[in-house]
Regions:
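A conserved helix-loop-beta module that forms one wall/lid of the active-site cleft
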Residues: 90-152
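Generic C-terminus detector
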Residues: 368-372, 376-432, 436
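Internal nucleotide-binding/catalytic subdomain
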Residues: 152-293
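ATP-binding N-terminal substructure of ATP-dependent carboxylate-amine bond-forming enzymes
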Residues: 1-95
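Solvent-exposed alpha-helices and their adjacent loops that cap or buttress functional pockets
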Residues: 21, 36-38, 60, 90, ...
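Short acidic-hydrophobic, aromatic-tinged amphipathic segments that line or gate anion-handling sites
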Residues: 43-49, 121-125, 156
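Active-site "cap" helix and flanking loop/linker of ATP-utilizing ligase/carboxylase catalytic domains
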Residues: 246-268, 285-358, 371
């Protein structure tokens, strides 16, 4: 089978790393890929949002199966166009991708089908939104309806912050068309966790949990980012809670999408808040998370490719996945200045020494470039250092030991990835046999 992965980040590197070892994979391509992915796949310089370019690439290379990494081409209908040309693809159609592409759509779906989520109101008028906020007061959450590169959500601690978020989205048009409508919702209290499930249109199969670290600084300080690290599984998500998530959130969503004429196939990524009233949905993403994918994939013992094919083909019923009885932890290294303006072009040394430090270490590239024989940072999030261990603490220790071998003065990372789990007494205990 000839397989194409669409994307260029750490998520796509993790996917290519797993797919390259599949006996079913005869040839592996990535568009556009990165220098790290070149070790696993043939990288082709076609942008992930260049739908016509991807279609031409598939025809030229006789691609049998496409796995779409980022959300933008999914929402734009890449899967629809691939399938229309007879090319099998893993990921939702544009209609089903509305679960991520429109916050308002998802909130309305939850309301219609009694899926637990925060109380909310939709607005297309800034003045009406402000009146609602003044009436309900902070803390309150303001969300741009459409895709905003992970920057469209404001958890406002004060009414002033909430009103400013409305102005940014609807008056200043900070997010363009994505902010033409906003959702204002109650601020849930509890602990956040990410949960993943493969979906085949009618059924869902748990694909693990994770907790990420959005803030740029230690102690969860500073501005939000795309994610500075993650670990899997999330100890806070007990077997009992996982069952509740599947029965009250994931499966009702899958059935709702089927009933709405938008059957969902792909991976469903639920951002959850574990509240006193049980798990509640914060938002859906319709693709693997980044950096969450980088900690899910190293724990998977089963062949990834047939699992993704089963989701696309509507055949999850008989699929069973095997998982390593270990924790995986990822630390993201970013260029200094991130998430603001960053310097590009600095050289990174010591990658090979870091990767060889421990057999559990895997380094997934994100925004790197190769210039001659030098590895160059291209700004933003640059590297993902992943380690496995019997506990979060052990995996954390291994990851930072590897990072300390990397010579990159212009880069930085958080030094406390995993702090939530380590703070729990059971974090250092052996994991139970089944930890999907």
């Amino acid at each position: 089978m000839r397989v194409l992965v669409v994307g260029s980040g750490g998520r796509e590197h993790a996917l290519c790393w797993a797919l390259s070892s599949s006996p079913l994979c005869d040839a592996l391509f990535c568009a556009p890929g990165n220098p790290g992915i070149e070790d696993e796949a043939a990288c082709v310089n076609v942008a992930s949002d260049d739908i016509d370019g991807i279609l031409k690439l598939c025809k030229k290379e006789r691609i049998d199966f496409v796995i779409v990494g980022p959300e933008t081409p999914l929402v734009a209908g890449l899967v629809d166009k691939l399938e229309a040309q007879g090319i099998a693809a893993f990921g939702p159609t544009a209609a089903a991708a509305a679960l991520e592409g429109s916050k308002a759509f998802t909130k309305d779906l939850c309301a219609k089908y009694n899926i637990p989520t925060a109380k909310y109101q939709r607005f297309t008028d800034a003045a009406a939104a402000k009146d609602y906020i003044r009436k309900h007061k902070a803390p309150i959450v303001v969300k741009a309806d459409g895709l905003a590169a992970g920057k469209g959500v404001t958890v406002a601690k004060t009414t002033k912050q909430a009103l400013a978020a409305v102005d940014a989205a609807m008056v200043a048009k900070k997010f363009g068309a994505a902010g033409g409508e906003i959702v204002v919702e109650d601020c849930l209290e509890g602990e956040e966790v990410s949960f993943f499930a493969l979906v085949d249109g009618t059924r869902a199969l748990a694909f693990g949990s994770a907790q990420d670290h959005k803030r740029v600084g230690d102690g969860d300080t500073g501005p939000n980012t795309g994610g500075m690290g993650a670990y899997s599984p999330a100890p806070v998500l007990t077997a009992e809670l996982e069952t509740a998530v599947m029965e009250k959130i994931i499966l009702p969503t899958v059935h709702a999408m089927r009933d709405e004429g938008r059957p969902f196939k792909g991976v469903l990524y639920a951002g959850l808040m574990l509240t006193r009233d049980g798990p509640q949905l914060i938002e859906y993403n319709v693709r693997f998370g980044d950096p969450e994918c980088q900690v899910l994939i190293p724990r998977l013992k089963s062949d990834l490719l047939p699992a993704l094919m089963a989701a696309r083909d509507g055949e999850l019923l008989d699929l069973e996945l095997q998982w390593r009885n270990e924790v995986a932890l990822c630390v993201v290294m970013a260029a200094k200045g991130y998430p603001g303006a960053t310097t590009k072009g600095s050289e990174i040394r010591g990658i090979d020494a870091a990767a060889a430090a421990d057999s559990t270490i895997k380094i997934f590239h994100a925004n790197t470039k190769r210039v001659g024989d030098k590895l160059i940072a291209a700004g933003g999030r640059v590297l993902n250092i992943v380690a496995r261990g019997r506990s979060v603490r052990e995996a954390q220790k291994r990851a930072y030991a590897a990072i300390d071998k990397i010579d990159w003065p212009q880069g930085f990372c958080r030094r406390d990835i995993g702090w939530r789990a380590i703070g729990r007494r059971r974090a250092s205990a052996p994991l139970p046999e089944k930890t999907p």
